[in-house]
Curated annotation (Swiss-Prot):
PANTHER family: CHLOROPLAST 50S RIBOSOMAL PROTEIN L22-RELATED, LARGE RIBOSOMAL SUBUNIT PROTEIN UL22M. Part of the 50S ribosomal subunit. It comes from the Eukaryota. It is found in: Plastid, Chloroplast. Its main location: plastid. This is Large ribosomal subunit protein uL22c.
Length: 115
């Protein structure tokens, strides 16, 4: 059994649909830390911003808490869970109202060091 350390970072209540976040997460899963940051920098999706922050935070956790080198980190697991929906009302004609649901999500990144 290998003795690899893993570090985790979580961003909660991101005001974006988990479906849109997962589209970007699939591009970086299994890649190295630096390669993932380069991919996120050039993707045309808004979801790249919050994901970039979480990956950066996980790398900082690895360096500060576990003393791991950022260059040796790879993204082991990354996923987006559904968060609570913000409920809003849009006024419509003749006194009616439509419900608007604004989705949120939680992004989790688990990185491990390779030897």
């Amino acid at each position: 059994m290998s003795n690899t350390q893993s570090v985790t970072a979580v961003a909660k209540y991101i005001r974006m649909s988990p479906h849109k976040i997962r589209r970007v997460l699939d591009q970086i899963r299994g890649r190295s830390y630096q390669e993932a940051l380069m991919i996120l920098e050039f993707l045309p999706y808004d979801a790249g911003g919050p994901i970039w922050q979480v990956i950066h935070s996980a790398a900082a956790n690895a360096k500060h808490n576990s003393g791991l080198d950022k260059k040796k980190l790879i993204i082991d697991k990354v996923f987006a869970d559904e968060g609570p929906k913000l409920k809003r009302i849009r006024p419509r004609a003749q006194g009616r109202a439509y419900k608007i649901l604004k989705p949120t999500c939680h992004i989790t990144v688990v990185m491990k060091a390779i030897d």
